[in-house]
Every structure is written in structure tokens, then in C-alpha cells.
Amino acid sequence: FRKGGAETVFFNTIQLLEKQGHTVIPFSLKNPKNEHSDYERFFVNYPELSESSIIEKFKHLTSFVYNREAAKKLEALIQQERPDIAHIHLMFNSLSVSILPVLKKYQIPVVMSVHDYRLVCPAYTFTDGEGNFCERCKDKHYYHCFTHRCSNKTLINSFMLSIDSYFRKHFYSPIEYIDRFI
């Protein structure tokens, strides 16, 4: 569904590609607000964490960082449909980097539209919890996001984003899996 700017670009891209005669296979999260898709059986169950309690957020920390269900469902989709290319819009904190090794396994080229600064700033914005310009994480010292409460001034959100950034730094750097950035 059209939640914000990135989702609008996602749907506009689908429309443009289909007008050019391409088959577009969406892969996303399940949500009651989603538009119907013939592929929704492959969509991933994942809660809206912004509306979740601290306990719920901790319960989902592992899938926030590495979502096994997303990897399994993407692999099933690839095996059925055999796509030529993958175009990623949003994956962090939901589908997660877990989808990248699956795409690489099947030698599917990956393009990513970059809608924010997430690749270099855990909180997406280059601002700290007080709204000041911030580059503290530029040398991959992501704990600053946590200590400065950069995500909506909340400790738990900032903690989760810091953990996710360290995980990507040490295990699944998107830079190593994505062929082109837009």
C-alpha cells in the first residue's frame, strides 16, 4: 500500500514497467491495506513495529535484523517464477538483508532504489535525537545511534537500528550484494 514516498515510487515503477510490456512480480510484507496481488501468498508476515510495545520489539529483534521467513518465501517465489532481475526499494528492518544471499544464490542481478540514507546512517536521516545534523556513524561506529537516541528519540528503536547496522557491517553488507544503485 502507499504508505509514503518510497511506496509511491514502487507502485509508479511497476506501472511504468508494465506499460513497457514487462512482467513485474512484487515481493513485500503482508498487510491488510495491501493492494491485491497474485503473488501475495509469498508475502511475509511481519508486524508494524512502530505500533508495537517494547516487549514485542524485542521479540522481533532477530527477524528485524535477519528475516528467515522472507528468505524462504523469496526462494520459493524465485523457484516458481525465475525472475531476470530484482529491483529493491525497501528491505531494511522488515524483509531484511536475508533476501540478498538468496538473490545471489540464484544469480539474479540486483538494483536498489535508494530512498534514504539507511546504508550509512542507522536512523536514515543524518540527524541525532535532538534533530541536529550528525555524521557520528560515518566510520561505522553505529552505537552513536543508540547513545544519542537518533530514532524518534527512543532508546529501543535506536538500539534496534544500531544492532541491525552492526549485523550488516559484519555479515551481510548490501554493498557486496547489490549490483546497481539508483
Predicted regions and their residues:
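N-terminal subdomain of nucleotide-sugar transferases
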Residues: 1-33, 79-81, 96-99, 103-109, ...
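Short beta->alpha connector loops
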Residues: 1, 68-70, 91-94
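Short aromatic-enriched loop/helix-cap "lid" or pocket-rim segments at secondary-structure transitions
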Residues: 7, 35-41, 99, 122-127, ...
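Membrane-proximal helix-turn-helix segments that form the acceptor-binding/catalytic region
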Residues: 105, 118, 133-181
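Short N-terminal targeting/anchoring amphipathic segment
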Residues: 75-95, 109-113
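Short, flexible loop segments at the rims of nucleotide/cofactor-binding pockets, characterized by
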Residues: 61-66, 87-90, 156-163
